Every structure is written in C-alpha cells, then in structure tokens.
C-alpha cells in the first residue's frame, strides 16, 4: 500500500545515513554508488532520499573528484526523530483523519486519548535514539551474526 512507500523511503534513508556514518568516520566522503552497492539499494531512489537528508542539513554534499556525502554533525548529535522527520514528516506527525463525521465525539476521544499519546511516545522514543546508538547496535548485531557458524546440508 501507500504506507509501504513511505516506510521504504524512511527505511532507505535511515540505512543510507547510517552507512554514511560508518564509512565517513575519518573524514572521507561516501558516494551514492558505494552506498547503493553495499546496501543493495537503487541509486536513483537513494539520490532522492539523500537530497531530503541534505536539505535537512543532516548530511553535507561535497563536490569534486573526491566528492560524495559526509555527516553534517557528529552521529551522537543526530536523533532518529530528526532523520525520520527529514524523510517523511507525517510519520511522527499527527495526520489523523476523522473518517466518520457522525462519530466525531468518539473520534475526538480517540484523538485525545490514543493518537496524541501514541504520537508523544513515538516522538520521545525516536528523540532518545541517536545515529551513533543505531550504528553501534548494527555493528554489534552483525558481529554476532558473523560469529555464528552456518551449516549447509
């Protein structure tokens, strides 16, 4: 559905900025091509996502022969909320549509009691996670997966 498109965009953006964080730690730039190769993502799609992240000033584009992208600030200063908001502001926003006009009183209760609280929880949760934590978690998980032997029958 339509939600999948948004989810894919957000997911792609999180993966891309995490990849840039992991591969630009020594100041070297990360190209769209290298991210696409490493993560199995479409270069064209990645360009759009990186444009959103650049416009939000989370990453910086460097021009020239050694051009590419770098983080605009330290990964511990970038929150998951900032990343998601840059990619799709509606994900953590209150875009709750009232479907049934005759039932607005109950819809109002849902808005106040459920959706608003859920939105606040999502916002504070994503605000509490930094890009650094995300990268560290990924590195820990992938290291654990590598250390487990695989048996093929």
What function would you assign to each model-found segment?
Residues 44:
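Key DNA-contact positions within bacterial/archaeal DNA-binding proteins
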Residues 57:
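Glycine-centered, phosphate/nucleic-acid-interacting loop/turn motifs that mediate DNA/RNA or nucleotide
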Residues 50-51:
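Short, hydrophobic-biased segments on the C-terminal half of alpha helices
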Residues 1-5:
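Short, small-residue-biased leader/transition segments that mark boundaries at the very start
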Residues 99-153:
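C-terminal regulatory/oligomerization modules of transcriptional regulators
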Residues 75-99, 120:
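Conserved segment of winged-helix/HTH DNA-binding domains
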Residues 65-72:
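Minor-groove-contacting beta-hairpin "wing" of winged helix-turn-helix DNA-binding domains
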Residues 8-11, 18-41:
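N-terminal helix-turn-helix DNA-binding core of bacterial DNA-binding proteins
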